[in-house]
Swiss-Prot record:
The lineage of its organism: Bacteria, Pseudomonadati, Pseudomonadota, Gammaproteobacteria, Lysobacterales. CDD domains: LysRS_core (cd00775), LysRS_N (cd04322). One of its GO terms (cellular component) is cytoplasm. GO terms for biological process: lysyl-tRNA aminoacylation. This is Lysine--tRNA ligase. Its cofactor is Mg(2+). Mg(2+) 1 binds at E415, E422. Gene3D superfamilies: Bira Bifunctional Protein, Domain 2 (3.30.930.10), Nucleic acid-binding proteins (2.40.50.140). It comes from Xanthomonas campestris pv. campestris (strain ATCC 33913 / DSM 3586 / NCPPB 528 / LMG 568 / P 25). The gene is lysS. It catalyses: tRNA(Lys) + L-lysine + ATP = L-lysyl-tRNA(Lys) + AMP + diphosphate. NCBIfam families: lysS_bact (TIGR00499), PRK00484.1 (NF001756).
Amino acid sequence: MTEQTPTPQLPADENSLIAERRAKLGALRGQGIAYPNDFVRTHFAGDLQAEFAEAETWTAEALEAADRSVKLAGRLMAKRVMGKASFAQIQDESGRVQLFLQGNVLGDAYTAFKGWDVGDIVAVEGGLTRTKTGELSVKATALRLLTKSLRPLPDKWHGLSDVEQRYRQRYVDLIVTPEAREVFIKRSKIIRAIRAWLDARRFLEVETPMMHYIPGGATAKPFTTHHNALDLDLYLRVAPELYLKRLVVGGLERVYEINRNFRNEGVSTRHNPEFTMLELYEAYATYHEIMDLTEQVIRDTAQGVLGTTQVSWDGADIDLAPAFRRWRMDEAVRHHNPEISAADCTDRAALLRHCERLKIKVKPSYGWGKLLLEIFESTVEHTLVQPTFITDHPVEVSPLARASDTEPGYTDRFELFINGKELANGFSELNDPEDQAARFQAQVQAKDGGDDEAMHYDADYIRALEYGMAPTGGLGIGIDRLVMLLTGSTSIRDVLLFPYMRPEA
């Protein structure tokens, strides 16, 4: 009966509407308990809609003959008062259902109902029937107000038209925008499906520290905090990688964590300062096996949650069923930049000339590896629409990845791109403690040269590697971006319940 909802009092000042509702709340307080908490529901709206969906089978007569008694509670989303009988619609977490209310049955409760407002939370008890228009309805025998809503909801025609308001007041967005609720329900299912997939393959879920003595595990600028009792500066983690690999050293050969990371960097449609990552490590796996795993977990999650491997994302139709393309970074750069030769890819002077020609800004400290990455990000990344693994990154930009046995200067690393966006990063892990120590030293020099995102030297992690870490493959998947892909969302803020926003003025 949503089409019967009365047009909201648009000309009325919101403050006056709030004042009216506060007056009603005052009257309720005078009558006793204004916010009762003794109602126990037995059913959900969506479950009833599903169970009795067959209108030809479950006619009004059949429903009333079944004599099913139900108790529901939810938010009043629409009401239509017609004198001795009225209709209303309530919404709970599962969906909506119509109420059929009769004055001669409900008595004083019916009189009270006439003064209730859309947005109030109510409880109803009764049997089931079907209206002449075929809509399943609860034929109320009892009706109560549980929570008085003091602020009017946005009208149904315009909803929350201000996108920023949707993010700031997600609680309102979830009430009035079914599509927003569906995104977050899918998000929960996606994470649950990933956990089940990994658990079935003997991966162990673990928890590692959120506050680190030394920021590490990724090239990123950390948030800093201070431990008062210890008088010690700490860092919110940018990645759990080094702790998870310590666990592999300890003999936990398949571990994963789904949790928050924090990076003190910019905000965009793809970046939020805090975000959710899946990070996993598997002993005796190479980056080739980890690519296989990445491909399969994404494909199976899509099929399990959506029932399909074909999705639309930001104007592109993505097919997750075929094998994902695997393409070396230097080959991808040369394909999109025919002027760059194979020899140029490891020649710093040549790459500097190409960056100047392409108007790519670089820093004097960049080596050939960083320059190659800059060219890739500027000229190739945005073209990768269908799922593509970009492999074999330079050592300079991969401080934790194992060096290639066959390609000097490169690593056994990959990143997964879909529709021009990075979704995953993985590699064969560097388990040579002396090589890792040298890479940390290079990162320290880069930091001293002004690179805020370069890593610190982690002596304890080197000590752990000196005990011996099995050959290992690792993976990180950005859960937020994966949810964006599988829900067709174009902004990371659409898949975060409470995205970062500047404080309201």
